[in-house]
């Protein structure tokens, strides 16, 4: 037995020296057996490297080399090697996920004994953290008794007592529970026992690339030193520390402490300690050697003479604008180097923390077509299998809530039979829309035997598009059947399960019978076929983790009474700590890692990115279950062979060593960079002290890594075709912004890209630089195909066209509609109001009555049954969905009663009576009403206008039927002459014309057009409050009346007249004392004025139809002054992307006109159409 140290700083070749010693031992005795131990994550690389070196020393002629006496292993694989046939190794393995599950169980069962951790069993984040802490304690050889001893040594009032006491209780239970399992600590302990009892006199053990050991690993190494023929430990250390450990500041602090511990232990065991050997220097560039000197002198606070700049060309510093362009520049430089003969494996990219770069790594390296391996653990908690299992529990907890069911289905692991994935996705989208629109939720609705029916909620009878109801009904019922036939079955089995084993078995069988396991296999096979090993293994590892958790659950709680909540929490805790094991997809790839992970020093060029002052040195993390102060309390009570890793501020002492190893992993060149912008926190970064000191000591001027721009040379940004396309777009955009010509070289880039397979994308992106948000015009032939040669339109559609032509095209040409949602909108309440008012007034008319004939009590009794009947119709489900909605329905009933009661009061003051409600003119859908309005168009075809008048009030005279059009509105409306002139308020004039054209005897003569506000008015209390009068005023009709003189309006409000004067409380009418109209109180049009308005209205309708069929779809929203409501209130903002600030988008800005101005224009030439902006470009 004996102990040999191989020392040397990071400029030396430790692996080469070790290989020479291995070769010598192999040749010395044919019985000698070699175990070469390295950290697990570099085992494969180390094995390849060692065998290459041994082959070189053996001078194998044909290049083939095999060796069966050399084993390159990690500690875990060494345990397998010696223990694989023992009972200990056959025990179930307690991996991180299973360990977390076990700790969750312990927390739940021991909460009555605990103080501060009693309520943490449901906190999966804490459970994961606690599980790691317990594992660390066991690996550190620390027992519950050690914790109790520490607690006993504390004063009664010490703030750490409760925490350490709880941890001691939990650790005591944990030690008992892990007995049947093989843990890392138990395997290392078992390995120690085996090694003590075996003849290792011909066994030579080499340990390389270790700088620190856990207590369990230290015990194993000490046993090796005591029992093996010889143990050789290689340490990155500039000198030995036999008598005392190194003292900070010292660059080699971690390795020096390990040397001292092993040296003293060997000395105590009276094991011979060989003379230290020093590794030979490895080939390094001059700059890298100079960098190594700087590390030692700067860390040890020694003065250093400034170096010549020429010596330092192999060390580069750079400052990037942000993390994305920092990493992109690195990728570009690697791409250029490989084009000149380098290999991808020559490069290593390191960061202290990769988090700021994790999201962009795949995209950047794919853009440059560079194979890469990111050595970073990825959590498994978002895998579709995990999401599916979580969703099953959530569905049971929340009674088939929309979010939970859709989350389950969107995993795409549960599929209907005989439905391909494209059809499933389409059906799922339809179902998603249906659920959002109808608010369907709950097990009862999902499992009902009656099929669902797809329909347009509150169907718009004005919509003439084809109804896809049958196809979509089939789709939503396919999804409904899938859920109803699968999910309830499992949930019932969980409800009836007696033991944990029954519940676990039912979940596994359900996954099997529903095809989830088959779908996972399909995913794996597809990934393999695509050559995506990482994706393939992710699916396999997720399934393996799940089955391991299920087995562990069955082992731990299989015979116990089944507790569903506990089952869920244990699975969640297990998955929360599970990660994917990754392997490189190719041997020749760029490795991306963190400086905290040991790597073999085989790269030629190392890039260290993210060198900010918060990452280098790293900000110490002291947020574990046991913080640094508590670890020190514990350490004071422990013997030397029991300890925990350092945490908190003390770890900063070893930070220089970690970064030193990373920097010195390169043999030829180091590039150190940092981004100025912290994109995660939207703040500015500062350079690392290492960066600043290195710049000063080596006289380096940092380069600037900025995005490619107009002045960037092509040589500097040479990259893959896809990367060059990105750079071209940026440079061309900069040229356009600065109004400068694009250089011929950049123009040549675009020309070259157009000769590659990227030509379509290059053409599209280049076109985006000159893009203006101008939809142009539709070809008239296409417009006719969209709308028909004879246009059948409603007034509201034409108003939309005059407000925004492009929105009309989106809404009625492309038939784009916003996604309907399950909510009570103004349109819903408006539809209900219209339906109730129509039915009640129709009932009265059929009975030969009017509102003036009934009492307020009659109204109050009639409305609630009507509301109840109408809300049972399809489309009104929301009003019965919740107690709150039921309350709102009752409020709507009271509001309708108030509205009708007030109408009753109004009709007692007027001679006009409702003749019809919901009076249709023209054809709407399959129904026809009164004759519609129809005019020929200048270039052929006709425009046919349809509509529905909410209420038509009529007063019969001997020679005429004077009528008033009444339109119900949920907000207050007035007749605006300017709006009518510009075409954004065509409704009232069109309705008046439609009725005036109806043949009748005596003829219909317009008396007015009025808006009625459906509202629930509020009144301020006062002593002189008269509710009847105030309600009349609140419900006052607004609009216009038609008359030559006061006699024409005598029947409108019988409480006033031209003779008596006064002001109406129900219509916009007032008289002066002399009998003339008081125009401050009235809105009166003469018959001649009305005729001019109607002629202009007709011209607007014909003009709009002509423009629509001509393909005019300008994006020029109507605007008065500075208002922007046409855009801000539009459902299509995200499509239009209208932004006047660009200088390309413009409003159709018009002046607001008064009645006098409007009358002046329409009486001069009623057919004159106001100017509308229309872009000249063609679509």
Curated annotation (Swiss-Prot):
Does the keyword Nucleotide-binding feature in the UniProt annotation?
yes
What SUPFAM superfamilies does the record point to?
P-loop containing nucleoside triphosphate hydrolases
User: What biological processes does GO assign it?
Assistant: double-strand break repair via homologous recombination
Q: What is its EC number?
A: 3.1.-.-
GO terms for MF: 5'-3' exonuclease activity; ATP binding; double-stranded DNA binding; helicase activity; hydrolase activity, acting on acid anhydrides
Q: Which InterPro entries match?
A: ADDB_N, DNA_helicase_suRexB, P-loop_NTPase, PDDEXK-like_dom_sf, PDDEXK_AddAB-type
Q: Which cofactor does it need?
A: Mg(2+)
**Which terms are listed as keywords in the entry?**
ATP-binding, DNA damage, DNA repair, DNA-binding, Exonuclease, Helicase, Hydrolase, Nuclease, Nucleotide-binding
Nuclease is among the record's keywords: yes
Subunit comment for this entry? Heterodimer of AddA and RexB.
What additional remark is attached to this entry?
Despite having helicase-like domains, this subunit does not have helicase activity.
Give the UniProt family note: Belongs to the helicase family. AddB/RexB type 2 subfamily.
The job of this chain, per UniProt, is described as: The heterodimer acts as both an ATP-dependent DNA helicase and an ATP-dependent, dual-direction single-stranded exonuclease. Recognizes the chi site generating a DNA molecule suitable for the initiation of homologous recombination. This subunit has 5' -> 3' nuclease activity but not helicase activity.
Quote the protein name from its UniProt record. ATP-dependent helicase/deoxyribonuclease subunit B
